[in-house]
Swiss-Prot record:
This is Platelet glycoprotein 4. It is a multi-pass membrane protein. Expressed in the apical side of lingual taste bud cells of the circumvallate papillae. Highly expressed in the intestine on the luminal surface of enterocytes. In small intestines expression levels follow a steep decreasing gradient from proximal to distal segments. Expressed in macrophages. Cell surface expression detected in lung alveolar macrophages, dendritic macrophages and lung macrophages (at protein level). Disulfide bonds join C243-C311, C272-C333, C313-C322. Glycans are attached at N79, N134, N205, N220, N235, N247, N321, N417. Pfam families: CD36. Residues 1-7, 462-472 are cytoplasmic. Palmitoylated by ZDHHC5. Palmitoylation is required for proper localization at the plasma membrane. It catalyses: butanoate(out) = butanoate(in); (9Z)-octadecenoate(out) = (9Z)-octadecenoate(in); (9Z,12Z)-octadecadienoate(out) = (9Z,12Z)-octadecadienoate(in); tetradecanoate(out) = tetradecanoate(in). Residues 30-439 are extracellular. Its main location: membrane. GO terms for molecular function: amyloid-beta binding; high-density lipoprotein particle binding; lipid binding; lipoteichoic acid immune receptor activity; low-density lipoprotein particle binding; low-density lipoprotein particle receptor activity; oleate transmembrane transporter activity; oxidised low-density lipoprotein particle receptor activity.
Length: 472
């Protein structure tokens, strides 16, 4: 009887030990299986989970616009006063709803090339008004004229055309005209062939972005989605030195197994440069743990604050010999037009940039850019891209509309908030197929290990106690 009991206790302890060992073994084996599955499914080729969502995003993406309506146009033009602005919006469009086109796999260098069609559909229910709402804004053509044509004689000719067309420093335009283009009366009088259509995003609809060529990750998963070339080149030809390099992905996804210490690099054709985001915090997105990476203030800092930015300063006068910060001159990739990009309301910009403008209220939470990345797959499940478009206008003695200006202005035209969040159905599917399975496996591993250890200890204690009792 005692032997049977002792044997039973030993058997229980052995079973506990086996369960504990099995649970311990399952941890690295399970992690290896998860890693193998993830590596297979994030490859950009037909049949994988990543490819299906990569070709056409399953997330609805909206682009909201706030327009800076100028309240004192005559006072500015006559007296070079501070520009008083009032933001109006949001006006919302649905974007990025078209699938990638001309998708071509290259098995030799393990890349896939494509173009991204552009399109925007107005969403009245998500907007404060209609596309016909009017705004008083800087006259884009008049402001750009002396910047592009600096010869005095040419400016005299342009001045006569500006006066003949009854154009001035400011103009009234509808939302639709301002964003997507309008026939400019001044440019229509220019006696040689030039584009007479002007708009902040003209041309956009029915155009494509690319050609992009990205690594598909089949031979090296650490390179998946990283851009190999853009428009057939590995550099942009806009910036000197390393600032001209195309780095990282397009921010829709990143190589898997993202760590908090990693700097996420990505290229944005909207701002004509590569940029980066750093870890900010952990958040829960519809039950999915994600890492929030944020665009740091350092990204638009002056070379004095961040020496790595020295090659983004290509102009010495407006930038006060490269000491100003928070704005980026992207004129070289906008056909020489004086276009400057910043964060909304000149967030993180130097005081000299925002001082001539009244009515701005920068707010970190409302105006910063962030990416919410699921760390195991590297998929971006939520994002907010926030940018402001500004135009430089300078005094021009030969152009009457600008001759009274006593200083240059970087004039805010609008700011945009492009957002996308994984839908509820997609989130549930993601949890079921990815995070749910990983969580379940982890629970099984810990349960086996925990139960095994408890069984082993309990049965061994009982065995020792029983043996001690029998010995007496």
């Amino acid at each position: 009887m005692g032997c049977d009991r002792n044997c039973g206790l030993i058997a229980g302890a052995v079973i506990g030990a086996v369960l504990a060992v099995f649970g311990g073994i399952l941890m690295p084996v399970g992690d290896m299986l998860i890693e193998k599955t993830i590596k297979r499914e994030v490859v950009l080729e037909e049949g994988t989970t990543a490819f299906k969502n990569w070709v056409k995003t399953g997330t609805t993406v909206y682009r909201q616009f706030w327009i800076f309506d100028v309240q004192n146009p005559d006072d500015v033009a006559k007296n070079s006063s501070k520009i008083k602005v009032k933001q109006r919006g949001p006006y919302t469009y649905r974007v990025r709803y078209l699938a990638k086109e001309n998708i071509t796999q290259d098995p030799e260098d393990h890349t896939v090339s494509f173009v991204q069609p552009n399109g925007a559909i107005f969403e009245p229910s998500l907007s404060v008004g209609t596309e016909d709402d009017n705004f008083t804004v800087l006259n884009l053509a008049v402001a750009a004229a002396p910047h592009i044509y600096q010869n005095s004689f040419v400016q005299v000719v342009l001045n006569s055309l500006i006066k003949k067309s009854k154009s001035s420093m400011f103009q009234t335009r509808s939302l639709k005209e301002l964003l997507w283009g309008y026939k400019d009366p001044f440019l229509s009088l220019v006696p040689y062939p030039i584009s007479t259509t002007v708009g902040v995003f003209y041309p956009y609809n029915d155009t494509v972005d690319g050609v992009y060529k990205v690594f598909n990750g089949k031979d090296n998963i650490s390179k998946v989605a990283i851009i190999e070339s853009y428009k057939g080149k590995r550099n942009l030809s806009y910036w000197p030195s390393y600032c001209d390099m195309i780095n990282g992905t397009d921010a829709a996804s990143f190589p898997p197994f993202v760590e908090k210490s990693r700097t996420l690099r990505f290229f944005s054709s909207d701002i004509c440069r590569s940029i980066y985001a750093v870890f900010g915090s952990e958040i829960d997105l519809k039950g999915i743990p994600v890492y929030r990476f944020v665009l740091p203030a350092n990204a638009f800092a002056s070379p004095l604050q961040n020496p790595d930015n020295h090659c983004f300063c290509t102009e010495k006068v407006i930038s006060n010999n490269c000491t100003s910060y928070g704005v980026l001159d992207i004129g070289k990739c906008k056909e020489g037009k004086p276009v400057y990009i910043s964060l909304p309301h000149f967030l993180h910009a130097s005081p000299d940039v925002s001082e001539p403008i009244e009515g701005l209220h920068p707010n970190e939470d409302e105006h910063r850019t962030y990416l919410d990345v699921e760390p195991i797959t590297g998929f971006t499940l939520q994002f907010a891209k926030r940018l402001q478009v500004n135009i430089l206008v300078k005094p021009a003695r030969k152009i009457e509309a600008l001759k009274n200006l006593k200083r240059p202005y970087i004039v805010p035209i609008l700011w945009l908030n492009e957002t996308g969040t994984i839908g509820d159905e997609k989130a549930e599917m993601f949890k079921t197929q990815v995070t749910g399975k990983i969580k379940l496996l982890g629970m099984v591993e810990m349960a086996l290990l925990g139960i095994g250890v408890v069984m082993f200890v309990a049965f061994m204690i009982s065995y020792c106690a029983c043996k001690s009792k029998n010995g007496k």
